[in-house]
Design a protein with these regions (language model features):
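Acidic, glycine-rich A-domain
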Residues: 1-226
């Protein structure tokens, strides 16, 4: 039944999405309404690297901030330069969801050059933390490997689908927590998921860069095995 399923969604809040934000938000809202209608647990996160202040493992200032990595695992991919911002969840009341849908949509209209203010409401100038930046899709996939199993356990469900609403190519995760660079000319790169004991090697021979796109493919394969 529906109660055995859940949905975790990740929304690309980046500069390349500027003129596609409102249309993509409409797609997102349809998914949220579907989850509410069939009563399945869900979470929606925006991913961004423009959030004010570099995230710090040693300076978590609020219980509302969840760190998905252990900084002592020096060989792990370092995805500390981005944030996930929770947009929606099944824990919100109906009026809270409606209000937040309006606020996110008005911010999308602001970036899209919206003009018909009188009839449909005024666009909102986004707060500094929600300015558009790069596309840390790969960073979000790495975080999802912690978030989705935890979400599954907390909700007592068997199957969780992940949805990534994005338009473009991610920039690569280029270093380990130790600071070691994983990018280089003619250098074979591989990523190991120690939980599932799966290693996937990227085809980077004779290629100058370990591209974000190749890394996305590897990370999605690893996420699927979770």
């Amino acid at each position: 039944g529906a109660t055995n399923h859940g949905l975790v969604m990740f929304f690309d809040w980046s500069g390349s999405m500027q003129y596609n934000l409102t249309q993509t938000l409409k797609q997102l809202y349809n998914l949220v309404w579907f989850c509410d209608r069939v009563k399945i647990p869900y979470r929606v996160y925006a991913f961004s690297d423009a959030y004010e202040g570099a995230p710090s493992y040693s300076r978590v200032v609020s219980e509302e901030i969840l760190v998905t990595q252990n900084p002592d695992n020096k060989s792990d991919l370092d995805v500390s330069g981005f944030r996930l911002i929770e947009m929606f969840s099944d824990k919100m009341r109906k009026n809270e969801t409606a209000d937040m849908m309006h606020y996110w949509y008005m911010m999308g209209e602001y970036y899209g050059g919206y003009r018909n203010w009188r009839d449909n409401g005024y666009p909102m100038q986004p707060p500094k933390n929600l300015h558009l930046g790069g596309t840390p899709l790969n960073h979000a996939i790495v975080a999802a490997m912690s978030i989705i199993p935890s979400f599954k356990t907390k909700n007592g469900i068997q199957k969780v689908n992940a949805v990534f609403l994005t338009d473009g190519v991610s920039h690569a995760v280029t270093r380990k927590i130790s600071g070691e660079d994983i990018n280089g000319y003619n250098k074979e790169s591989y990523i190991t998921d120690k939980i599932t004991n799966t290693t996937i090697t990227s085809d980077t021979k004779n290629s100058r860069y370990y591209s974000g796109e190749k890394q996305t493919t590897i990370l999605l394969q690893l996420l699927k095995k979770r």
